[in-house]
Amino acid sequence: FIQQITGVLEYERCYLNTQHQKDLVINQAKKTFNDDTITKLNDILVPQHLGVDEKDIVDEINETPEKIIVFNHRPDTYKHFKEFVAVCDELYEMRQDFKVWVPLLPNPTRKYMVTTKGNKEWYYKELQKCYVGFSPKQSYGGWSVSTTDGMMNGVPYIMYDDTYYHELNEMGDFFEDDYTALQLLNTYLDDPEYRNEEASKALDWMRNKLVYKDKMLEMLFYMDRLVIETRAVKDTDRFKEIVEWIKTAGKLSKKDIIERLGWGRGIKWTPYRRALMNHPNIFDVNGSTPYYYYKY
């Protein structure tokens, strides 16, 4: 961990999927690094939400869905699946007017469960039939693609009350414990009008906040600004030496050049790369190992 953070401190920016993941890194780093370093790390680490493809967002919600509660996450311990089943068991003792769809479970373990499966197109169509989704507590706080899959298909989700779900839809309904989760499920099942209002709000949130293209444009604008602000090195003796090495060898990788220069982590490569890209006789080829070539 310490070695990885030392490397990250050389970055201009490092992206994570959620604020929760950033908080985990910062809290762990505080055990080793001083306050100034933590402040620098905090500026470098930036949550970058994954988003969804705009064309996958449905035009409108299904206002007459079947009474199906969907748990489209992995049915594993780190997703608190047993706790979810315990809530559903209690709900089933109170009422039997619902089903629970767990598409990633091999076979049903309760009479109220269904585990039907299909391809991606079929999966999206089945989600559109669902009444409400359930997003459980997570051990690692990653981005929940399962939740966005449902919301972009018009399904409202009740979510565990933590930052990694507030980022998905801060206007949604959240539960802190099993009792609250049970009450929310009853509310949705009893009140179709309320369910449809929450489904519409979730769909609007997806359109306005979580479109992948918009998130990538944010990243692109930042990178463009960073490149503009990063000046290329001038025509120094050291730069001329690098050009001569590439000319003599025909091609050299960044690693080859840095090893010849004897540089450590503290020297930034980007200004030299910009200068090489501005040179009329040098071009780069990206691959598993990027190379700089000299052309005559």
Give the label of every model feature segment.
Residues M152, P156-M159:
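Short hydrophobic beta-strand element within catalytic cores of glycosyltransferases
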Residues K125-G142, V155:
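Acidic donor-binding loop of glycosyltransferase active sites
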Residues Y124, V145-M152, Y165-H166:
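Short alpha-helical segment that forms part of, or immediately flanks, the ligand-binding pocket
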Residues I5-I44, V52-E54:
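A short, active-site helix/loop in glycosyltransferases that binds the activated sugar's phosphate group
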